[in-house]
A protein has these predicted regions:
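N-terminal core-entry segment
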Residues: 1-74, 79
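A structural signal for small-residue-enriched, beta-sheet-centric alpha/beta enzyme cores
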Residues: 59, 65-74, 83-92, 96-183
Length: 183
């Protein structure tokens, strides 16, 4: 049984609950360890509470590093956030369905994003590009061995350049506006 941190400790979930949502998402059984690892990451208060209850349009980035990404045929290159990549899409979708069905994360109730969350159906789920990266792998940078697989979940701004005002009014920004606000 896994329990999220405050204020979400009122609900708890099991691997069975996650597996049910994974099946609904169309995930293959071999994806389950990655989905469970992502859900375990979300039990940390700093990730879960901030992103999920924010009025900003943050979204989750779920990065898989290590050999499991290749085994699951996750995309780490061109189009990695696009359609057609079953592992990427269904892992992210299983996490999202788990948050909705187990954590009751309904828009306008707990999920308060004013304009929604980009990629909220699948989040930004991708594999680290081990073949083309000139740097050491992310999992090695965290102190793991190259043969270890890791799942990292973090919040990212939804990839849009907009200011959000009360009531959902938005305004696009440009570089000059950003620099003017700094100066």
């Amino acid at each position: 049984i896994m329990q999220p941190s405050p204020p979400h400790e009122a609900w708890e979930y099991t691997v069975e609950h996650i597996a049910i949502n994974a099946v609904m998402a169309g995930a293959r059984p071999e994806y389950l360890p990655v989905i469970i690892a992502a859900m375990e990451c979300l039990t940390e208060e700093s990730t879960f509470t901030h992103m999920m209850s924010s009025e900003g349009s943050f979204t989750l980035a779920i990065m898989v590093s290590g050999p499991i990404a290749r085994e699951l045929k996750m995309n780490s290159g061109v189009g990695l956030l696009g359609h057609g990549w079953r592992a990427n899409n269904t892992i992210g979708r299983a996490v999202r369905l788990s948050l909705i069905n187990i954590g009751y994360l309904w828009p306008g109730e707990i999920d308060m994003a004013l304009i929604g969350r980009p990629s909220s159906h699948t989040f930004y789920t991708f594999a680290e590009n081990l073949e083309q990266s000139p740097w050491e792998t992310f999992n090695v940078g965290l102190g793991y061995k190259p043969e270890d697989s890791c799942v990292t979940v973090d919040t990212v701004m939804g990839g849009i350049g907009m200011r959000i005002y009360g009531g959902g009014v938005v305004e696009p920004w440009d570089v000059k506006q950003v620099l003017d606000s700094i100066v």
